[in-house]
């Protein structure tokens, strides 16, 4: 007897976020590439230090990484680190909250698969 795995019937989990622009843009985030996950895990412990020191290069790298993660979405919306700071009015504390929430989301997905 043949078995059928129909990917059209699989519900893909997303983390839905609402950005702080005037339109309150809603974005449905998907699981990112493995490389982005590794980068996020690598920088997470350093984020509070960046907040304390205000190191501009580290701030820029963090905003750019978060922008690449947010750009992994079902909506086809692409954002940059500069847009997160300006258009979407995200300060660094919001970036930390986002990263923490996003890592929780990834852990839930990973645990659900096991």
Where in the sequence are the language-model features?
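Short acidic-hydrophobic surface loop/beta-edge motif
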Residues: 11-22
């Amino acid at each position: 007897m043949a078995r059928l795995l129909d990917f059209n019937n699989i519900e893909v989990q997303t983390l839905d976020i609402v950005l702080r622009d005037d339109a309150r843009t809603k974005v449905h985030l998907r699981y990112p590439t493995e490389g982005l996950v590794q980068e996020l895990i690598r920088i997470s412990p350093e984020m509070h230090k960046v907040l304390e020191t205000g190191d501009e290069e580290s701030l820029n790298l963090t905003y750019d990484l978060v922008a690449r993660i947010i750009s992994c979405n079902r909506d086809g919306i692409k954002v940059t680190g500069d847009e997160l700071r300006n258009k979407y009015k995200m300060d660094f504390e919001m970036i930390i909250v986002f990263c923490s929430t996003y890592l929780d989301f990834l852990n839930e997905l990973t645990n659900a698969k096991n």
